[in-house]
A protein has these predicted regions:
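RNA substrate-binding interface of SAM-dependent RNA methyltransferases
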Residues: 33-132
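Strongly charged, low-complexity linkers/loops
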Residues: 135-146
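Short, solvent-exposed amphipathic alpha-helical segments in soluble enzyme
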Residues: 57-61, 148, 167-170
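A C-terminal functional module that forms or caps the active site or interfaces directly
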Residues: 147-166
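Short connector loops at helix/strand junctions that flank enzyme active sites
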Residues: 10, 20, 34-38, 61, ...
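Structured adenosyl-cofactor binding patch, chiefly the S-adenosyl-L-methionine
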Residues: 162-176
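Short, hydrophobic beta-strand segments that form beta-sheet elements in well-ordered domains
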Residues: 130-136, 155
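N-terminal positively charged helical leader segments and presequences
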Residues: 1-31
Length: 176
């Protein structure tokens, strides 16, 4: 069977003993995990049920860094959800790794204050990347086959408000 060591190599294993108390395996971890997707995802918090699916799929796709942010359209109660607790996050990240046959756990940063995050942290985060913000009214086409690291900001259900789009563009983002 396929096996992997969290944040380590992947390989194969064979069960050698199984009983009521334990399972023993011979394991060989001889391959590097898949290359990470060169994407930092900045994601406005969504309903917890949707968040569970999104974080699992991001992990399965090979994204290695997600930053959860607040937005005017995000309900305050979402930030109190148990899904944001460390153990709960780990559960959904591991499910994604299993689906993606990967072992490198993505980093989840939680930034519940929009303006301080955009002004104080975001300029350093986007250095060396192409920063895009998903915006339904953007005139710019979303590029493909970019071939370099990128940062993508995705708004909440209902989208970022004009002030938030303005702040992201001032920081260096292109609306697509």
């Amino acid at each position: 069977m396929r096996v992997g060591l969290i944040n380590g190599n992947i390989g194969g294993g064979r069960i050698t003993l199984i009983n009521e108390k334990r399972v023993e395996m011979d394991v060989v971890l001889d391959r590097e995990p898949p290359a990470p997707l060169q994407l930092t995802l900045i994601f406005a918090m969504v309903r917890p049920r949707v968040f569970k699916r999104a974080i699992t799929q991001a992990s399965a796709m090979g994204i290695k860094r997600i930053i959860l942010i607040n937005s005017y359209c995000v309900e305050k109660s979402f930030w109190k959800s148990p899904v944001l607790e460390k153990d709960s996050l780990a559960k959904y990240l591991i499910i994604g790794l299993e689906q993606g046959q990967d072992t490198i756990v993505l980093e989840v940063l939680i930034r519940p204050l929009f303006k301080p995050f955009v002004e104080d942290e975001l300029p350093d985060i986007i250095k060396g990347t192409l920063p895009f913000v998903a915006h339904p009214y953007a005139s710019e086409q979303c590029p493909y086959n970019i071939g370099q690291p990128l940062t993508l900001a995705v708004g909440p259900e209902g989208g970022f408000i004009p002030y938030e789009i303005k702040k992201l563009i001032e920081c260096g983002f292109t609306a697509v």
